[in-house]
């Protein structure tokens, strides 16, 4: 029989013992962590917004193996500041205007801390009843807040669940729609299923379609144009469906968007849903970013027609000041989802589940284990109240309007898409570049604006990103970081203007 071999690295070494969950150690280290983060937020503007490091930088700084002996929290936090901070892009910086916001808040962070400290695994009601029931209650609260029809709420026969990301939500709803359709046509016809979206729909939808087993060639990305403000044209959808029907295919699923990633275009829900209903197509409404704005009554008209859809989602972690991750999904018929995803092995059997009087959220998602996400959103709603949350969002939209006005007043620039929420899309215009450099085509204009954006980002002062729509390169300026105020908007515009002036005068 082989003997146990002792690693000489450990043989004879004295190892310090430490408690894994000592209350006093937690209190001391927790205070230090809170102070560390508070100092970070206080000094966040001192850091370049986008990380300036090169790939592989961290491997050169850290040892090639884990420490044998424990290290004090003071040293660990020192290492965070010296080694980790240079590799951070600071999403909470007031000068972060890239992508869409991933906005945080004191309540959101403390809610995350509370959830992590309790560390319950709420896959079923019995596993932690409060986790399940608070999630159901908060989902109804939030649904009422954005004025979702009662049919989406638990109180009206529907229901909501918190998942990680939009991609997870899309996958779950596609699978629910797929299984429901194949019950009618037979599983052997899965290769005939077709899904529809606009060419502006978030790219995660295509990933979800691929994972769900739908053939890649049966994904219809219907082109949009500036004439419809890059929203999905209902007649274009109808033509695509009719062509597929003639080819013997089975229309399955339509993903609509309220606030597309590139330009925050809004698809016309009502006519799209009416067409989908004619053909028995499941309609999902993705409002990942813009859904948060719908807590304000003046933006709820963008959801007109959602009563005709099957499911709706938005990300509270984007613009509702709740830390990543927290994607909220509502369904009018949750049984379609649970029928597709439910499992009930003997190890999870219990009287509450067997009674069918409780929600088991394991059957509403891909994974079994799940976090206590509702706790942080509950804290956000309670700590700030609806009135303050609405005003935070309105202030971001007003700041975006201010930036848009600054751009419009400079004749060298042009606004490239309607500003529906807090995103402004702009560029240095073809006319300005034609006057200065005799540019005559969009390729040259695109190249100039790409160089302008990189110059702006390299300064470290602000961070913005770009998109390309109909072959046109445009710079995206998204307001939504929790610390942003008007001076940051003015500073960002000065950076844009000064870098443009420098390049135009070169």
UniProtKB/Swiss-Prot annotation:
- Tissue note: Highly expressed in corolla limbs and at lower levels in corolla tubes and ovaries.
**Listed CDD domains:** DOPA_deC_like
Keyword list, A-Z: Decarboxylase, Lyase, Pyridoxal phosphate
Q: What induces it?
A: Follows a circadian-oscillation with the highest expression in the middle of the light phase and the lowest expression in the middle of the dark phase.
Q: Which residues form the signal peptide?
A: none
A Gene Ontology annotation in the biological process aspect, one of them, is: carboxylic acid metabolic process
Q: Which cofactor does it need?
A: pyridoxal 5'-phosphate
| Residues that bear N6-(pyridoxal phosphate)lysine | 318
- What does the record note about activity as a function of pH? Optimum pH is 8.5.
**Role description:** Bifunctional enzyme that catalyzes the decarboxylation of L-phenylalanine to 2-phenylethylamine, which is then oxidized to form 2-phenylacetaldehyde, a constituent of floral scent. 2-phenylacetaldehyde is a precursor of 2-phenylethanol, another constituent of floral scent.
Kindly give any further remark recorded in the entry: Flowers of plants silencing PAAS, neither produce 2-phenylacetaldehyde nor 2-phenylethanol.
Name the chain's protein: Phenylacetaldehyde synthase
- Name the species this protein comes from: Petunia hybrida
Per the record, the gene is PAAS
